[in-house]
Structures are given as structure tokens and as C-alpha cells.
């Protein structure tokens, strides 16, 4: 299981799996599955992208 909170610095690797469930994950190794909270209806995020920031009109996995 992934830790609930990654403490690694931005760009560093960490123990997160590809499904990254960390609240504050900034690691390059697992950022691909983490994104800002997406607007309602973002299909990409609904497919497993972990919400890690307050909701916004844009996110890293749906443009």
C-alpha cells in the first residue's frame, strides 16, 4: 500500500506505486497518476487520477 503522505522533495523518487495515493505527492516517479482536483465531469481523473489539490477549472490529466 502506498503511504498516505509522501514527504519526498519535488523531483525526487519515493515509495509511491504507480497508483499514487499520497496526499502531497510531488515526486517525479509517481506524479503521473496524481493531479489537481479536476472539475466535475473530468473523465480522465475519474479513471484513477488521484486528487491532491483544491478543485480548479484545469488539471494536469485533462486539458
From Swiss-Prot:
A divalent metal cation 5 binds at residues 35, 37-38, 51. SUPFAM superfamilies: Metallothionein. A divalent metal cation 4 binds at residues 34-35, 45, 49. It holds the Pfam family Metallothio. Transmembrane segments: none annotated. A divalent metal cation 3 binds at residues 16, 20, 25, 30. One of its GO terms (cellular component) is cytoplasm. InterPro entries: Metalthion_dom_sf, Metalthion_dom_sf_vert, Metalthion_vert, Metalthion_vert_metal_BS. A divalent metal cation 2 binds at residues 8, 14, 16, 27. Gene3D superfamilies: Metallothionein Isoform II (4.10.10.10). A divalent metal cation 6 binds at residues 38, 42, 45, 62. Signal peptide: none annotated. Residues 1-30 are annotated as: Beta. GO terms for biological process: cellular response to cadmium ion; cellular response to copper ion; cellular response to zinc ion; detoxification of copper ion; intracellular zinc ion homeostasis; response to interleukin-1; response to lipopolysaccharide. Keywords: Metal-binding, Metal-thiolate cluster, Zinc. A divalent metal cation 7 binds at residues 51, 59, 61-62. Metallothioneins have a high content of cysteine residues that bind various heavy metals. Class I metallothioneins contain 2 metal-binding domains: four divalent ions are chelated within cluster A of the alpha domain and are coordinated via cysteinyl thiolate bridges to 11 cysteine ligands. Cluster B, the corresponding region within the beta domain, can ligate three divalent ions to 9 cysteines. Belongs to the metallothionein superfamily. Type 1 family. This is Metallothionein. It comes from Gallus gallus (Chicken).
Amino acid at each position: 500500500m502506498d503511504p498516505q503522505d509522501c514527504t519526498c522533495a519535488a523531483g525526487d523518487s519515493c515509495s509511491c506505486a504507480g497508483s499514487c495515493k499520497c496526499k502531497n505527492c510531488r515526486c517525479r516517479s509517481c506524479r503521473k497518476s496524481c493531479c489537481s482536483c479536476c472539475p466535475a465531469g473530468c473523465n480522465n481523473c475519474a479513471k484513477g487520477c488521484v486528487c491532491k489539490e483544491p478543485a480548479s477549472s484545469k488539471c494536469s490529466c485533462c486539458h
